[in-house]
A protein has these predicted regions:
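Gly/Ser/Thr/Ala-enriched C-terminal appendages of enzymes
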Residues: 1-177
Length: 177
């Protein structure tokens, strides 16, 4: 560094922020790599803090809306090649407390992630700022008031598919060996 002297060494949040009060809410972590044969190799970051353990693999995110209300019921994170059949009831579970299960029925599923680039080419037309604002308002309106309130809000459900959860658990087990 052009003559600069190093007088300190630290790792991650311990170097940049106070460990007890980290300021970075979202940091990109490697989720998977593709080998020369096109095989996807899922990766995970393990942490003592359960909330910092990453979700491995290439993923899709679905939002479930009640057909009768139009309100958002839950989000489901799946493997990139999984599909959701919204003509059938579906049991989802809390990945942190797997005994907490919920059967979702009479719902419409919508993929939330859209490709921006494919094979190095931009395939997405950016919306205007007013279009982004209108979309955000519309999406917030799909949330139940109980989720949006500031006092004792209901938790909005974001679950993992069984396949994705199984991969995460296997990677956690293998990291202990």
């Amino acid at each position: 560094m052009q003559g600069a002297q190093i007088d300190m060494f630290g790792v991650g949040e311990r170097m940049i922020t106070a460990r007890s009060e980290p300021v970075f809410g979202g940091v990109y972590k490697l989720a998977a790599v593709e080998d020369d044969e096109g095989n996807i190799i899922p990766k995970i970051k393990v942490s003592e803090n359960v909330e910092k353990i990453t979700i491995p693999h290439f993923k899709k995110v679905y939002r479930f809306y009640g057909r009768d209300t139009g309100k958002a019921i839950a989000d489901l994170i799946t493997l990139h090649d999984e599909t959701v059949d919204d003509t059938q009831d579906m049991e989802i579970f809390d990945p942190m407390a797997t005994w907490k299960k919920k059967t979702v029925y009479n719902f419409a599923a919508r993929e939330l992630l859209v490709p921006i680039f494919l094979s190095g080419k931009r395939v997405y037309d950016s919306p205007t700022l007013p279009e982004i604002q209108a979309y955000c308002r519309q999406q917030v309106d799909t949330l139940w008031d109980e989720v949006k309130r500031f006092d004792n809000p209901h938790k909005y459900v974001v679950d993992l598919s069984r396949k994705l959860w199984d991969i995460q658990q296997e990677l956690l087990r293998s990291s202990q060996r």
